[in-house]
Amino acid sequence: MTLFKACLTGDEPGAASLVSEMVSKSQPSAIWAILMHAAAWNEQRDFDTPHSTIITHSIHRMIQELGPNSDILATKPPSSKLKTPNDLSEPLQKALLERLALHLAAIDHWVSERGPRYNVDTRLDSLDMTMGNYTQSIRKQAQMSALSFALRLGSREDPVRLRRTTASLAAEDPDSLGHGFIMPMSLMTELPSSDYKLPFQAVLWHLTDYLVRKVPQKQPDGFKIDDQMDRMAPPTSLSKHKSLIATSIFEYGVLGHNGIFAQRIAAAAKSGLVHSYTVDWLLDRLHQNIGTKPLTTQQLSIEKLIRKKPGTNWDQLPSGIDLPNSGKVRLWLVKSATDYWDKMMDLEAGVFEEVIPDISKKDWPIVKAAQYAMSALNGASRASHVIIFTQAVWSLAEQGLIDNSLAALQVHRMLKQYLKGR
């Protein structure tokens, strides 16, 4: 059985085992293309936003942030400020990849008649004309037409026009949870190369299926479009918005969406995926979603936050998730990080919270990795937000937009609130 088939038939243990076997035997880009192909077949039956490509993006970034690994990552990632020990990072990277495959098998999938389409004609118009037609097709809710133009734009070696146009459209009305921007931005950063024909086509079908439902039929008043979509915009610094970003992490909202939205804005701003005035537009929407004034530095004092608002206690421990490499990760944490790991997994939230102000600089990589493990190796295999939020918060800390102590506190509180049994 192939990994793709295991995911679509709901074979959770099989999917985790197969992806584990592929490591070191297959090209990393092929592994990620297959996983994105499976993600594109996710049918979200309860809400309006499928999270399969969002969690794929988050786990891919988690693995990158844990350090280089040529068996799993196609390119060497930027050096992280928090360098995780190799004897922890490597099994944790593998376990995260296995957790992703497990999740993609656990979620709902389209029946073949209603899922992604592969036989779509593409027209050879100019790129600028194709970009305009792509936009108009989305606004007219004509998915197959939009897909045809997306395939044309995406077939470039560097599909910058597709990435930037999609991000701009997604920014117009991100909704009260930020989904409208979070999902397309996550998907576009994980778009497989057109060399992987079927995954490439399926992922763009998944994207256009979403955009025609979420993008406004008319551009909102006051929204500016960059007239140079053929190149990335200059990076935008968010250093002046640290209080808003930190507030989004403290007031993280339902399932952590405020923090996730903030991180996707920060990533798009840093990469130049959106222009500075689009960043401002998105930050304004984030502020509206939070619903409160940004907190001051004094209000965000970690000691005050711990005293002011206690975290949620567990009634019982969440179910553990067994993966080919989960045992190695747990064993490392029990043997080498017992103090932190035991406190994190205690039923009472305050047991770990009270040590956060005293965590030394050298221990932050362990705390971060332990929270990655806590989010991924516990709970339900269908759960996604616990992982997505954990990665988002630590990514903001990596960028220097929030303190490590705030990241650790709020990830811990979110996991205590939302990690459940199977």
Region annotations inferred by a language model:
Residues M1-R422:
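Mature, well-folded catalytic/scaffold domains that follow N-terminal targeting or propeptide regions
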